[in-house]
């Protein structure tokens, strides 16, 4: 999906679920890490996280759009637009939008090392030169076995 398509979808979702126009910009922001979208109070623009579209699909992404549009329309109407406000929670239920986003699993490369002397093995996120370090248990020489990818929750 491109910026133009995102803008068009945002306008369509706004008309379909809120019966109101979306008159500002909707843009992708790949720097967003732990949130699906963000409503900007000063400019009234909405930033969306493209990773949620890739990981969870268009249906879930439309849910995030509805959530951000709840912030947008309530703020412009000078009603309670924050998560804790009653107006916001009621509008979320009315349009069937999620209150919070699911977390995107993070991909981490782990490097596996083993001691040639005692056989102890361990995982590290950072690679290091095995010639410069020794085993902490027995002082033996270390050997890199390889690396593997692990998926974890964002913090």
UniProtKB/Swiss-Prot annotation:
The keyword Transcription does not apply. GO terms for cellular component: cytoplasm. Pfam families: SprT-like (PF10263), Zn_ribbon_SprT (PF17283). Binds 1 zinc ion. Its cofactor is Zn(2+). InterPro entries: SprT-like_domain, SprT_Zn_ribbon, Uncharacterised_SprT-like. Belongs to the SprT family. This is Protein SprT-like.
């Amino acid at each position: 999906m491109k910026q133009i398509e995102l803008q068009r979808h945002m306008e369509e979702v706004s008309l379909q679920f809120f019966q109101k126009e979306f008159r500002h910009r909707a843009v992708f922001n790949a720097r967003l890490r732990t949130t699906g979208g963000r409503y900007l109070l000063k400019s009234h623009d909405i930033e969306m996280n493209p990773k949620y579209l890739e990981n969870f699909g268009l249906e879930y992404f439309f849910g995030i759009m509805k959530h951000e549009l709840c912030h947008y329309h309530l703020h412009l109407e000078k009603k309670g637009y924050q998560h804790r406000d009653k107006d916001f929670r009621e509008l979320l239920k009315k349009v069937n939008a999620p209150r919070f986003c699911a977390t995107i699993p993070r991909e981490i490369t782990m490097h596996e090392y083993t001691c040639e002397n005692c056989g102890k093995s361990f995982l590290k996120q950072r690679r290091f030169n095995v010639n410069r370090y020794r085993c902490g248990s027995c002082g033996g020489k270390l050997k890199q076995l390889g690396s593997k990818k692990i998926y974890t929750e964002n913090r």
